[in-house]
């Protein structure tokens, strides 16, 4: 799938999800203009899984590209561990692990985490030197996934959106020490962290 068709697919997906669900409250600026109509089958577990797998596939391709182009592979693990970018992660209290699984708590954490990742994807959009269409496709699809999962939460108004001031501070932190090595290290760390977060999310939506 080329860049243009990838973006077109993702834009279509976001349009479908935005018009398919009633929005009880704001979910960030991107969802304020949602319209109300009948729910689509996109909320079914298999459709949600398919979307997560699609995003994971795009991330895997970008990681492979970084590995081949900049030699940023598993040998970067130690260096990456030293870079604290405050990336969203799953913890025991989030209720997403099989032991102590709590669907409501977990869905809330996944949805919030996906919204928190948007600022990191903004950074990738600016700094990633590979296929820009892949980054845009991931960002659009993450927004669509957050919208889908929000409809599964019993109290969607309680889903918190990132504070603009916090996001601005995060972006400043990301853009600091932005020489080629650090930039590429940050990119691979963000991709790896998002991949792990989505893999936890995939397992969580499968738990009945």
Swiss-Prot record:
A biological process from GO: regulation of insulin secretion
Main subcellular localisation: secreted
Residue positions with a glycan: 167
Pfam families xrefs: IL6
Signal peptide: 1-20
Entry's Gene Ontology molecular function annotations: cytokine activity; growth factor activity; interleukin-6 receptor binding
Localization annotation: Secreted
InterPro entries: 4_helix_cytokine-like_core, IL-6-like, IL-6/GCSF/MGF, IL6/GCSF/MGF_CS
Highest rank taxon of the organism: Eukaryota
SUPFAM superfamilies, alphabetized: 4-helical cytokines
UniProt keywords, alphabetically: Acute phase, Cytokine, Disulfide bond, Glycoprotein, Growth factor, Phosphoprotein, Secreted, Signal
Disulfide-bonded cysteines: 67-73, 96-106
Keyword Phosphoprotein attributed: yes
Record's GO cellular component terms: extracellular space; interleukin-6 receptor complex
Phosphoserine, modified sites: 76
Keyword Transport belongs to the record: no
Role summary: Cytokine with a wide variety of biological functions in immunity, tissue regeneration, and metabolism. Binds to IL6R, then the complex associates to the signaling subunit IL6ST/gp130 to trigger the intracellular IL6-signaling pathway. The interaction with the membrane-bound IL6R and IL6ST stimulates 'classic signaling', whereas the binding of IL6 and soluble IL6R to IL6ST stimulates 'trans-signaling'. Alternatively, 'cluster signaling' occurs when membrane-bound IL6:IL6R complexes on transmitter cells activate IL6ST receptors on neighboring receiver cells.
Summary of subunit composition and partner proteins: Component of a hexamer of two molecules each of IL6, IL6R and IL6ST; first binds to IL6R to associate with the signaling subunit IL6ST. Interacts with IL6R (via the N-terminal ectodomain); this interaction may be affected by IL6R-binding with SORL1, hence decreasing IL6 cis signaling. Interacts with SORL1 (via the N-terminal ectodomain); this interaction leads to IL6 internalization and lysosomal degradation. May form a trimeric complex with the soluble SORL1 ectodomain and soluble IL6R receptor; this interaction might stabilize circulating IL6, hence promoting IL6 trans signaling.
Family: Belongs to the IL-6 superfamily.
Protein name: Interleukin-6
Biological source species: Delphinapterus leucas (Beluga whale)
